[in-house]
């Protein structure tokens, strides 16, 4: 449409210029013909009228041509502006058409991008799970390392405590061995003292028996020193079973019980026991039997003395009369102790 309008404007312009040229040519021909006619018989009035009429027509045509030229220039400028504007529009339309043609490819690329984004999301989720697993593994490794450190510390602590325990046991064993040696030494001393005491008592009884011919215990002789406690301790040692001396608590209980029993037995072997002992009397044997017993007792006493010197823990040989006295005294003490226990139980129940 614009091209046809431009072609028309160009054709009008060409026609206008060709018309102006033809008018100029005609005016020249008219001048030439006037000159020719003037030579013949010029009529100045008619020529003047024709000239004025042609000049007026020419002036009007020239003015119209100028107006048309100006209007054509305006139209040409507007047409140029319109052509530039429409050229821009056409370029934009072409670009829009190209973009519209590229829409399917863009949609395909967009679908590919969405698929790749979905794959990336899945990969990110998987990576997150792997990172969580790695974090758990790192925590487990830290925990195992901490456990190893703690176990090493515990082993070192156990070793130190075991060494301390071994040292403490060694000290206790040494102390216990020393106490056992001291106790054995004291027991040996007590046994020797008791043996000496019984030998003296036996010699006195034998002298009385040989001089009088009979043996009657009138009263209980007073013990020399702390012989009552020694007798009770030896009797208890003879009655008790063997214990494991490695146990310190059992040793303490044994020593405490021995001291308490000594304290209990020493006051009880007083006038009450002497009443029971005073009633004991022995029948007088014959002279042959007496000599036989004396020889046997002397041999046994010498044997026991030699054994005590070698071993230090063998029991002392006693006479029959002394055994009877000790047994009766112990029986009386046991009866009184049982009665006191019963009374204590009754008192505790009443309380």
UniProtKB/Swiss-Prot annotation:
One Pfam assignment: Dysbindin
From the UniProt record, list the coiled-coil ranges: 106-179
Composition bias (Low complexity) maps to 295-306
* Superkingdom classification of source: Eukaryota
Name one process (GO BP) from the record.
Answer: platelet dense granule organization
Q: Where is this region: Disordered?
A: 291-325
Name the InterPro entries for this protein. Answer: Dysbindin
Q: Where in the cell is it found?
A: Cytoplasm; Cytoplasmic vesicle membrane; Cytoplasmic vesicle, Secretory vesicle, Synaptic vesicle membrane; Endosome membrane
Keywords tagged on the record: Coiled coil, Cytoplasm, Cytoplasmic vesicle, Endoplasmic reticulum, Endosome, Membrane, Nucleus, Synapse
Instruction: Tell me the membrane topology, using the record's own terms.
Output: Peripheral membrane protein
Q: One GO CC term of this entry?
A: plasma membrane
Instruction: Describe its function.
Output: Component of the BLOC-1 complex, a complex that is required for normal biogenesis of lysosome-related organelles (LRO), such as platelet dense granules and melanosomes. Plays a role in intracellular vesicle trafficking. Plays a role in synaptic vesicle trafficking and in neurotransmitter release. May be required for normal dopamine homeostasis in the cerebral cortex, hippocampus, and hypothalamus. Plays a role in the regulation of cell surface exposure of DRD2. Contributes to the regulation of dopamine signaling. May play a role in actin cytoskeleton reorganization and neurite outgrowth.
Q: How does it assemble?
A: Component of the biogenesis of lysosome-related organelles complex 1 (BLOC-1).
PANTHER family noted in UniProt: DYSBINDIN, DYSTROBREVIN BINDING PROTEIN 1 DYSBINDIN
Q: Give the record's family classification.
A: Belongs to the dysbindin family.
User: What is the recorded name of this protein?
Assistant: Dysbindin
Q: Which species is this UniProt entry from? A: Gallus gallus
């Amino acid at each position: 449409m614009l091209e046809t309008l431009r072609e028309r404007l160009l054709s009008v312009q060409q026609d206008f210029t060709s018309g102006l040229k033809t008018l100029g040519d005609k005016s020249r021909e008219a001048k030439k013909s006037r000159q020719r006619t003037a030579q013949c018989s010029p009529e100045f009035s008619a020529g003047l009228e024709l000239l004025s009429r042609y000049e007026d027509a020419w002036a009007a045509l020239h003015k119209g041509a100028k107006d048309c030229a100006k209007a054509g220039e305006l139209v040409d400028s507007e047409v140029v502006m319109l052509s530039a504007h429409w050229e821009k529009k056409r370029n934009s339309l072409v670009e829009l058409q190209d973009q519209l043609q590229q829409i399917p490819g863009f949609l395909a690329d967009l679908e590919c991008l969405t698929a790749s984004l979905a794959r990336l999301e899945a990969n990110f989720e998987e990576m997150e799970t792997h990172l969580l697993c790695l974090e758990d593994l790192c925590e487990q490794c830290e925990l195992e390392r901490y456990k190893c450190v703690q176990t090493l510390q515990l082993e070192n602590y156990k070793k130190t405590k075991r060494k301390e325990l071994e040292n403490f046991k060694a000290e206790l064993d040494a102390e216990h061995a020393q106490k056992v040696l001291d106790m054995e030494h004291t027991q040996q001393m007590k046994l020797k003292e008791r043996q000496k005491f019984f030998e003296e008592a036996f010699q006195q009884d034998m002298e009385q028996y040989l001089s009088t011919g009979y043996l009657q215990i009138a009263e209980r002789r007073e013990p020399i020193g702390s012989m009552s406690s020694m007798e009770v301790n030896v009797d208890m040692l003879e009655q008790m079973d063997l214990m494991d001396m490695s146990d310190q608590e059992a040793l303490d209980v044994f020593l405490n019980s021995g001291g308490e029993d000594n304290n209990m037995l020493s006051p009880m072997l007083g006038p009450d026991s002497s009443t029971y002992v005073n009633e004991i009397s022995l029948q007088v044997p014959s002279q042959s039997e007496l000599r036989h017993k004396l020889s046997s007792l002397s041999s046994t006493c010498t044997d026991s003395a030699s054994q005590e010197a070698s071993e230090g823990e063998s029991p002392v040989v006693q006479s029959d009369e002394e055994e009877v006295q000790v047994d009766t005294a112990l029986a009386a003490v046991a009866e009184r102790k049982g009665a006191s226990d019963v009374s204590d139980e009754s008192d505790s129940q009443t309380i």
